[in-house]
UniProtKB/Swiss-Prot annotation:
Residues with the Phosphothreonine modification: 114
Family: Belongs to the villin/gelsolin family.
Function of the protein: Membrane-cytoskeleton-associated protein with F-actin-binding activity that induces F-actin bundles formation and stabilization. Its F-actin-bundling activity is reversibly regulated upon its phosphorylation by the cAMP-dependent protein kinase A (PKA). Binds to the erythrocyte membrane glucose transporter-1 SLC2A1/GLUT1, and hence stabilizes and attaches the spectrin-actin network to the erythrocytic plasma membrane. Plays a role in maintaining the functional integrity of PKA-activated erythrocyte shape and the membrane mechanical properties.
Gene Ontology molecular functions: actin binding; signaling receptor binding; spectrin binding
Organism per entry: Mus musculus (Mouse)
Protein name: Dematin
A family per Pfam: AbLIM_anchor
Lineage, uppermost ranks: Eukaryota, Metazoa, Chordata, Craniata, Vertebrata
Entry keyword set: Actin capping, Actin-binding, Cell membrane, Cell projection, Cytoplasm, Cytoskeleton, Disulfide bond, Membrane, Phosphoprotein, Repeat, Tumor suppressor
Compositional bias ranges of the Basic and acidic residues kind: 229-242, 252-261
Disordered: annotated segments: 1-29, 81-100, 108-332
Gene this chain is encoded by: Dmtn
Post-translational modifications reported in the UniProt record: Phosphorylated. Phosphorylation at Ser-403 by PKA causes the C-terminal headpiece domain to associate with the N-terminal core domain, and leads to the inhibition of its actin bundling activity.
Length: 405
């Protein structure tokens, strides 16, 4: 009996919402009418969980159906209660708490007095979505991999070997696609990004040379024919002019004789203009038209520091700057054309006591070049060629010892 009193037995009813104007949709405004009883939001939440939710279309309209049957008297009153719940009065605001408590106790007593007939409980309908599983291959996560599908489809080891052969064949083509048979292969096109082959270049060069040779021979034959015609015409003119004995005729004959001289030379008589011949003959042809000091300057642009033994700087006959005209000083872009004057060693010595006044036109960085051969060998105990072969730091050390740095 206590269990029945704790569990409120309600008849099927409807849930309506009387929304307050101030707070629309608040939980306190949701009420339910069951057997002429008005239940609030908290009592709706206290309904046992074994009640089945049949249809949820709106959050404020829920229909509850109990698991037990009702008596004949309750079935007679059922349409009336539903009419009351669907009437416009059902949307009226909830009554006071006193009226609601009295009506609730009366309903509980009436439900307890009626005999309860137990019925078979019905399973509740699920209120969540189940995906369709009509087709077995609809779930992609349960499918085997593609290569296993092919194995299951083929089944035989021959199909497996065929697939492997296809994979190997497709790997030979770019992007695993065979080339279009209508288009030429990439290697057969004219475009080739790499340097040309020497064999191909040589064959093309021979073809061009043969074609040029044939064209030159044809031109020479035409020139020979035209020259013969011109000679014949001039001979006729000479014969006609030789008949004229006046001075005017002699002058015209002289002019024709001058014109008959070979003016142009054929291409075969010209020198070969290959890079090898040009490099060999260009130096002699250019230097022959220049004066002697110009030839020396242009032909010898290396310094005496890098010159081999036996150069002009070390020979006694080319002293006084004769052999040093063509020397190109380190750091200067132009060769030193002016003569290097020779001074005695005492005039070139630099002392630490005071700044020594050097002679005008002296290279302060290379004072040893203004020494004579005898003074150079006496100061440095070596020839200028040997001094030039030394390292820079070694030369500077020797010049410091000799007070020339």
């Amino acid at each position: 009996m206590e269990r029945l009193q704790k569990q409120p037995l309600t008849s099927p009813g409807s849930v309506s919402s009387s929304r307050d104007s101030s707070v629309p949709g608040s939980p306190s405004s949701i009420v339910a009418k069951m057997d002429n009883q008005v239940l609030g939001y908290k009592d709706l939440a206290a309904i046992p969980k074994d009640k089945a939710i049949l249809d949820i279309e709106r959050p404020d309209l829920m229909i509850y159906e109990p698991h037990f049957t009702y008596s004949l008297l309750e079935h007679v009153e059922l349409p009336r209660s539903r009419e009351c719940s669907l009437s416009p009065k059902s949307t009226s605001p909830p009554p006071s708490p006193e009226v609601w408590a009295e009506s609730r106790t009366l309903g509980i007593i009436s439900q307890a007095s009626t005999p309860r007939t137990t019925g078979t409980p019905r399973t509740s309908l699920p209120h969540f979505h189940h995906p369709e599983t009509t087709r077995p291959d609809s779930n992609i996560y349960k499918k085997p991999p593609i290569y296993k599908q092919r194995e299951s489809v083929g089944g035989s080891p021959q199909s497996k070997h065929l697939i492997e052969d296809l994979i190997i064949e497709s790997s030979k083509f770019p992007a695993a696609q065979p080339p279009d048979p209508n288009q030429p292969a990439k290697i057969e096109t004219d475009y080739w990004p790499c340097p040309p082959s020497l064999a191909v270049v040589e064959t093309e060069w021979r073809k061009r040379k043969a074609s040029r040779k044939g064209a030159e021979e044809e031109e020479e034959e035409e020139d020979d024919d035209s020259e013969e015609e011109i000679k014949a015409i001039r001979e006729r003119q000479k014969e006609e002019l030789s008949k004229v004995t006046s001075n005017l005729g002699k002058m015209i004959l002289k002019e024709e004789m001058e014109k008959s001289l070979p003016i142009r030379r054929k291409t075969r008589s010209l020198p070969d203009r290959t890079p090898f011949h040009t490099s060999l003959h260009s130096g002699t042809s250019k230097s022959s038209s220049l004066p002697s000091y110009g030839r020396t300057t242009l032909s010898r642009l290396q310094s005496t520091e890098f010159s081999p033994s036996g150069s002009e700087a070390g020979s006694p006959g080319l002293q006084n700057g004769e052999g040093q005209r063509g020397r190109m000083d380190r750091g200067n872009s132009l060769p030193c054309v002016l003569e290097q004057k020779i001074y005695p060693y005492e005039m070139l010595v630099v002392t630490n006591k005071g700044r020594t006044k050097l002679p005008p036109g002296v290279d302060r960085m290379r004072l040893e070049r203004h020494l004579s051969a005898e003074d150079f060998s006496r100061v440095f105990a070596m020839s200028p060629e040997e001094f030039g072969k030394l390292a820079l730091w070694k030369r500077n050390e020797l010049k410091k010892k000799a007070s020339l740095f």
